[in-house]
Amino acid sequence: RRQSAPSSDSAWKWVEWNVVVMIAARMHSTRLPGKALLDIEGKPALLHLLSRLRRASVPKAVVLCTSTHPDDQVLQPLAEQAGVGFFAGSEDDVMQRFLDAAEREQAEHVVRVTGDDLLVDPAYLDRLVLHHIREGAEYSCMPGLPKGMECEAVSVEALKKAKRLAEDSSWSEYMTWYLKVPEVFR
């Protein structure tokens, strides 16, 4: 779907973005396995998050990004039920998974959300993206939000640069930590 910035920000009203929200989720959490399917008010936890993210105005798409591990395929019906995209990629390299999904979606910018950040506010997500684009940032976040509401915006070019600079993919699950180095990324 094609979207423009929220009408409350008239200077950006007719600008269309090539931004995709990507949710990193899997079934093999070490602290709480299967947390994506935990029941909250009669629905899986992840379905609540996907439904919230669909209410954001600025991104052109929302994609659930998981791994090719057979156990993670149970997440695809949730993506379909929520009306969002689904992508299964590298099991061990989350950064590569996001890059592959971004390529498929032809995204210029990605908003990274983890599957356990169930309370991401679509309005804050939109504000984050607008700030990210206005500032020409490679990486943006909204510090100070309570746990569970966090999301991060990153240009696909910066993500590619981080991938090239990475010595190994073992830290890939925490891919945006490296992007927080101001001497390397804006």
What are the language-model segments listed below?
Residues 110-111:
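Short aromatic/hydrophobic "clamp" motif used to bind/position activated sugar donors
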Residues 57-86:
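Acidic donor-binding segment of Leloir-type glycosyltransferases
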Residues 80-93, 103:
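Conserved donor nucleotide-binding strand/loop of the catalytic core
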